[in-house]
Regions:
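N-terminal, polar/Ser/Thr-rich
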Residues: 11-53, 526-532
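Hydrophobic alpha-helical and helix-loop surface patches within well-folded domains
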Residues: 36, 75, 259, 291-564, ...
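Short aromatic-acidic-glycine turn motif
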Residues: 77-87, 236-239, 585-588
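Short acidic/polar inter-strand loop motif in beta-rich domains
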Residues: 80, 167-173, 620-631
Length: 666
């Protein structure tokens, strides 16, 4: 006899948790979020002209106690309008690794033009549109605008507004646009900003948070329900945020695809006539079922299977360590060859973009897995905890990089240098390059030295794109690892879980993370975290020298004196244990005070040559993740750092730069 799916799962010992949404993307039970900004969106794409016509019915609630007459909106695609936008200027000046808008030809450019803005009673607001520049004095920027209402929205009142717009799809850049018929459209509709209310993220009065499009920042938006209808040529396969709820064939050769999802902060979509669609169901005991869909180029099914494997690992890890992923679907998009650098490695609610590999290594190609797990991890920090990525990107990028690294380590994933062999020679040369580097060891390459800027800084205030990447990825991960080392893995895991559960769907800030740190780890842990994320403190504890000699001429069996000098070159107040090992095999551990000293000498007097100090090592339990130079952590009596250590140090520095550059792409 055939068993029903739910019965079969019980027989197999896999009992899923009850779903939070139905198969139409609608919440079952109480809303997960406040649903401040909800949209009914309709869009028609004309690929021949690269034109998009759209209509949005926005329902917005004034969460504050103050009437609101002026509404703030984003028009992100105007970043691609010309070389005068703030986005384009920052790209040209700061060296952003994405394709430069300043180098776009006229045919490459994209834009958004609002054609109508009407209230429910028909009142037209377009004449009140004003371009705003909250972050700089660039009067040529057109990425933020305001509309002024004839009557203010009362406290906790609701407004319905119809927006119509036309847009030109830009050449693919910074995760939006078109490349040889492949469309990926993020931030594609006029989107209302976030009205922050006390005590949210420390604001003292209701304040609009609606920043311009910047080259080194991502996004911030309120939660809401999205019901979206996309009309495109019949030949194109479509993937999007949420669940597909309808498909209508039209007489003009187009198809209207309808999607819905409650309680999300955004909606992104992709369309291409070259997609292969691969489906699977994620099932794990105690977690809700999730339908997984991979959209990959037709020749890359092997990549699709690995992308779905990696997504499933991340869904289970996040569900067990933070809180269960509640949505019914995940869509994984792998752009075609040539589009990955501009569209790959980006996260949206229920959807992310990954990568494909010709002939990926089996069973796990870490180039595929690492990006997929990182992007799937964003579902929690960017998508559901939903911190402000304009101003505090580390709360997403840093925590996600740390968390997805932990997930990879728990799954015993290993980096294999065979991944880097040329495509045509990978199978033949792979065995000669075979290596296994744990995720824990790989993360050590993301060390970051002391910087002139803190981690918790608005993205456009960093000196350049490289500094943004080093801080929000490298230094943030190293700082989290340092805090974890001080608190211990179990307590730090409890800190992260408490933060995730308490602030899911609530837009927390750095102050909220620090408050949970104090709650779980105590006042001392909060003080340390404050310096890690809001300061520029660094650490470079080192064994400076070991010197042994005889104070009297009594021969080798006479008394020996050994001095071990330990130097504290940083200003981060961490305990500094020192392990001392002697020639006779005995060991002892000393302590250098966390504060108040820059160096300390330990002196030992022992009889006989076997009593001499052989080796000394600071932090014997493992290097501090934020250590600027772990090469100098240990020294033996008979060796100095020498050329080998110097080369290792330079390699580590180069690895930091590579890790930061890669981080900026994720």
């Amino acid at each position: 006899m055939l068993l029903a799916p739910a019965v079969l799962l019980v027989v197999l010992g896999v009992t899923p948790a009850p779903p939070r949404f139905d198969d139409q993307g609608r919440a079952l039970g109480a809303p997960l979020s406040e649903r401040t900004a909800s949209y009914v969106l309709e869009a028609r794409l004309d690929p021949a002209a690269r034109r998009l016509e759209g209509r949005a019915l926005l329902t917005w609630t004034n969460r504050s106690e103050v009437p609101q007459r002026v509404l703030w909106f984003h028009a992100y695609w105007n970043a691609f309008r010309d070389a005068k936008s703030t986005f384009a200027r920052e790209q040209a000046w700061g060296g952003t690794p994405r394709e430069s808008v300043a180098g776009f030809r006229e045919a490459d450019r994209g834009w958004t033009e609002l054609t109508s803005a009407r209230l429910a009673d028909g009142t037209e607001l377009l004449s009140t549109l004003r371009w705003e520049h909250p972050d700089d004095a660039n009067a040529d920027d057109r990425t933020v605008f305001t509309l002024t209402l004839p009557t203010a929205v009362a406290p906790h009142g609701t407004l319905t507004l119809e927006l119509r717009w036309e847009a030109r799809v830009p050449r693919l850049a910074s995760r939006s646009g078109v490349f040889r018929g492949f469309y990926f459209l993020g931030q594609w509709f006029p989107k209302i900003g976030v009205l922050e209310v006390p005590p949210q993220r420390g604001v003292r009065s209701p304040t609009w948070n609606c920043h311009q499009a910047h080259a080194s920042t991502e996004y911030y938006a309120d939660f809401g329900n999205y019901d979206v209808t996309l009309t495109l040529p019949r030949s194109m396969t479509v993937g999007a945020t949420g669940v597909r709820t309808g498909r209508t064939e039209n007489a003009d050769g187009t198809v209207s695809h309808r999607f819905h999802q409650d309680d999300v902060i955004d909606f992104a979509w992709t369309a291409w006539d070259g997609f292969l669609e691969v489906e699977r169901t994620f099932r794990a005991a105690g977690l809700p079922e999730v339908q997984l869909v991979a959209l990959v180029p037709r020749s890359d099914r092997a990549s699709a299977e690995q992308l779905l494997d990696a997504t499933a690992v991340m869904l289970e890890y996040g569900g067990r360590h933070w809180f269960p992923y509640p949505y019914p679907q995940v869509t994984v998009v792998a752009p075609p060859v040539g589009a990955g650098a501009s569209a790959g490695g980006m996260e949206y609610p229920t959807l992310f973009t990954g990568d494909v590999r010709a002939h990926p290594l089996e069973p796990r190609d870490m180039v595929l897995w690492d990006v997929a797990m990182h992007e799937a991890g964003h579902f929690w920090w960017q998508g559901m905890v939903a911190s402000n990525e304009f101003e505090e990107a580390w709360l997403d990028e840093g925590i996600d990089t740390w968390g997805s690294g932990r997930a990879a380590e728990s799954a015993r994933l290993r980096w294999n240098l065979a991944n880097l062999a040329p495509v045509g020679l990978r199978a033949a040369l792979g065995p000669f390059f075979h290596s296994e580097i744990s995720e824990e060891d790989a993360r050590m390459l993301v060390r970051s030295t002391r910087f002139q800027t803190p981690v918790a800084l608005p993205g456009w205030q960093f000196p350049d794109a490289a500094s943004t990447g080093r801080s929000t990825y490298g230094r943030a991960v190293a700082s989290l690892g340092t805090l974890e080392q001080v608190l211990g893995e179990e307590r730090f895991a409890r800190l992260v879980r408490t933060y995730a559960e308490r602030f899911a769907f609530r837009h927390p800030g750095t102050d909220d993370f620090l408050a949970v740190t104090a709650e779980v780890g105590g006042a001392g842990a909060r003080s340390l975290a404050e310096r890690l994320f809001r300061g520029t403190a660094g650490i470079d504890d080192a064994v400076r020298s070991i010197h042994c000699g005889q104070e009297s001429g009594e021969g080798l069996d006479g008394p020996w004196r050994c001095d071990v000098d330990v130097e504290r070159r940083g200003d981060l107040p961490l305990p500094c244990p020192v392990a001392i090992r002697f020639d006779d095999g005995t060991e002892l551990t000393e302590q250098v005070p966390a504060e108040g000293v820059t160096w300390q000498r330990f002196t030992y007097r022992r009889a006989g040559a076997a009593g001499r100090v052989r080796e000394a090592r600071v932090h014997p339990g493992g290097p501090v993740p934020l250590d600027a130079d772990p090469v100098n952590d240990a020294r033996s009596r008979e060796a100095t750092p020498g050329p080998v250590a110097m080369v290792a140090g330079w390699f580590l520095h180069a690895a930091q730069l590579v890790a930061s550059a890669v981080g900026a792409l994720l």
